[in-house]
Amino acid sequence: MKSHPLALFRYCPRCGSAAFTVADSRSKRCADCHFTYYANAAASAAAVVRNAQGELLLVRRAFAPAAGTLCFPGGFAEHGESLETTCLRELQEETGLHGHAPKFLFSLPNLYVYSEMTVHTLDSFFAVSVDDETALFAADDASA
Protein backbone atom coordinates (compact mmCIF):
# COMPACT_ATOMS: atom_id res chain seq x y z
CA MET A 1 0.00 0.00 0.00
CA LYS A 2 1.22 3.49 -0.88
CA SER A 3 1.89 5.60 2.21
CA HIS A 4 0.68 9.16 2.62
CA PRO A 5 3.31 11.75 1.55
CA LEU A 6 3.13 13.30 5.03
CA ALA A 7 3.17 10.02 7.01
CA LEU A 8 6.38 11.00 8.84
CA PHE A 9 4.86 14.29 10.05
CA ARG A 10 3.06 13.47 13.30
CA TYR A 11 2.65 16.94 14.80
CA CYS A 12 1.16 20.14 13.46
CA PRO A 13 3.99 22.43 12.26
CA ARG A 14 1.99 25.49 13.35
CA CYS A 15 0.92 24.64 16.94
CA GLY A 16 2.67 21.33 17.71
CA SER A 17 -0.54 19.41 18.34
CA ALA A 18 -0.67 15.64 17.86
CA ALA A 19 -4.18 16.09 16.41
CA PHE A 20 -2.61 16.36 12.95
CA THR A 21 -4.44 13.86 10.75
CA VAL A 22 -4.86 12.96 7.09
CA ALA A 23 -7.32 15.27 5.32
CA ASP A 24 -6.95 13.88 1.80
CA SER A 25 -4.41 12.16 -0.45
CA ARG A 26 -1.87 14.98 -0.19
CA SER A 27 -2.70 16.97 2.95
CA LYS A 28 -3.00 16.81 6.73
CA ARG A 29 -5.13 19.05 8.92
CA CYS A 30 -4.81 20.01 12.57
CA ALA A 31 -7.99 19.54 14.60
CA ASP A 32 -6.78 22.06 17.19
CA CYS A 33 -5.67 25.11 15.16
CA HIS A 34 -7.28 24.12 11.81
CA PHE A 35 -4.03 24.50 9.88
CA THR A 36 -3.90 22.44 6.66
CA TYR A 37 -0.54 21.42 5.21
CA TYR A 38 -0.31 20.28 1.58
CA ALA A 39 2.49 18.06 0.28
CA ASN A 40 2.99 19.65 -3.14
CA ALA A 41 5.49 18.34 -5.67
CA ALA A 42 9.02 19.76 -5.44
CA ALA A 43 10.18 21.36 -8.70
CA SER A 44 13.44 20.31 -10.31
CA ALA A 45 15.17 21.00 -13.61
CA ALA A 46 17.77 19.16 -15.68
CA ALA A 47 20.01 20.31 -18.53
CA VAL A 48 20.13 18.27 -21.73
CA VAL A 49 23.39 19.29 -23.43
CA ARG A 50 24.64 17.88 -26.75
CA ASN A 51 28.10 18.50 -28.16
CA ALA A 52 28.90 19.00 -31.87
CA GLN A 53 29.05 15.20 -32.32
CA GLY A 54 25.55 14.82 -30.86
CA GLU A 55 26.79 13.17 -27.65
CA LEU A 56 24.77 13.84 -24.50
CA LEU A 57 26.38 15.22 -21.34
CA LEU A 58 25.73 13.03 -18.29
CA VAL A 59 27.16 13.27 -14.78
CA ARG A 60 27.74 10.48 -12.26
CA ARG A 61 25.88 11.10 -9.00
CA ALA A 62 28.28 11.54 -6.09
CA PHE A 63 25.74 11.10 -3.27
CA ALA A 64 22.57 9.21 -2.34
CA PRO A 65 20.05 8.65 -3.60
CA ALA A 66 21.34 6.55 -6.50
CA ALA A 67 25.02 7.39 -5.92
CA GLY A 68 27.17 6.22 -8.80
CA THR A 69 24.42 6.30 -11.42
CA LEU A 70 24.36 8.53 -14.48
CA CYS A 71 21.95 11.43 -14.90
CA PHE A 72 21.58 14.78 -16.59
CA PRO A 73 23.02 17.72 -14.61
CA GLY A 74 20.18 19.14 -12.55
CA GLY A 75 18.58 19.64 -9.18
CA PHE A 76 15.85 21.28 -7.13
CA ALA A 77 14.59 24.81 -7.63
CA GLU A 78 15.39 27.31 -4.90
CA HIS A 79 12.72 29.65 -3.53
CA GLY A 80 12.02 32.49 -5.97
CA GLU A 81 13.91 30.80 -8.82
CA SER A 82 12.48 29.93 -12.25
CA LEU A 83 13.04 26.44 -13.66
CA GLU A 84 15.17 27.93 -16.44
CA THR A 85 17.41 29.60 -13.85
CA THR A 86 17.51 26.36 -11.82
CA CYS A 87 18.62 24.44 -14.90
CA LEU A 88 21.46 26.86 -15.73
CA ARG A 89 22.59 27.14 -12.07
CA GLU A 90 22.72 23.37 -11.59
CA LEU A 91 24.59 22.90 -14.89
CA GLN A 92 27.23 25.41 -13.75
CA GLU A 93 27.46 23.98 -10.21
CA GLU A 94 27.83 20.37 -11.34
CA THR A 95 29.96 20.78 -14.48
CA GLY A 96 31.49 24.27 -14.53
CA LEU A 97 29.77 24.92 -17.86
CA HIS A 98 27.93 28.18 -18.49
CA GLY A 99 24.75 27.43 -20.40
CA HIS A 100 22.31 29.73 -22.12
CA ALA A 101 19.01 29.71 -24.01
CA PRO A 102 17.30 26.87 -22.09
CA LYS A 103 14.43 25.47 -24.16
CA PHE A 104 11.75 23.43 -22.41
CA LEU A 105 11.57 19.84 -23.68
CA PHE A 106 9.22 17.95 -21.33
CA SER A 107 8.38 17.24 -17.68
CA LEU A 108 7.71 14.07 -15.71
CA PRO A 109 6.37 13.33 -12.23
CA ASN A 110 8.87 11.38 -10.15
CA LEU A 111 9.46 9.95 -6.68
CA TYR A 112 12.71 10.92 -4.96
CA VAL A 113 13.63 8.99 -1.81
CA TYR A 114 15.80 11.03 0.54
CA SER A 115 16.47 10.45 4.25
CA GLU A 116 13.92 7.62 4.22
CA MET A 117 11.20 9.99 2.99
CA THR A 118 9.58 9.81 -0.43
CA VAL A 119 9.38 13.27 -2.00
CA HIS A 120 7.05 13.77 -4.95
CA THR A 121 8.84 15.82 -7.61
CA LEU A 122 8.07 17.37 -10.97
CA ASP A 123 11.21 17.05 -13.10
CA SER A 124 11.52 19.45 -16.06
CA PHE A 125 14.07 18.93 -18.83
CA PHE A 126 15.59 21.73 -20.92
CA ALA A 127 17.80 21.68 -24.01
CA VAL A 128 20.72 23.98 -23.17
CA SER A 129 23.45 25.46 -25.34
CA VAL A 130 27.02 25.91 -24.08
CA ASP A 131 29.76 27.89 -25.81
CA ASP A 132 32.87 26.29 -24.34
CA GLU A 133 32.88 22.56 -23.55
CA THR A 134 36.55 22.67 -22.48
CA ALA A 135 35.63 24.24 -19.12
CA LEU A 136 33.95 20.96 -18.09
CA PHE A 137 34.69 19.49 -14.62
CA ALA A 138 32.76 17.49 -12.02
CA ALA A 139 31.72 19.42 -8.91
CA ASP A 140 28.97 19.76 -6.29
CA ASP A 141 26.73 16.64 -6.54
CA ALA A 142 28.63 15.14 -9.51
CA SER A 143 31.62 12.82 -9.11
CA ALA A 144 32.44 12.46 -12.82
PLM-predicted stretches and their roles:
Residues 21-27:
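Short linker/helix segments within small regulatory modules
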Residues 2, 51-93:
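Conserved Nudix-box catalytic region and its N-terminal flanking loop in Nudix hydrolases
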Residues 1-8, 47:
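A broadly conserved sequence feature marking short terminus-proximal activation segments
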Residues 12-14, 31-32:
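Short, cysteine/histidine-rich loop/knuckle motifs that typically chelate Zn2+
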Residues 77-103, 108-144:
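Unchanged
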Residues 28, 32-56, 76:
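Conserved N-terminal beta-strand and adjoining loop/helix that marks the start
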Residues 9-11, 27:
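Residues immediately within or flanking Cys/His clusters that coordinate Zn2+
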Residues 20-21, 38:
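Short functional micro-motifs and their immediate structural scaffolds
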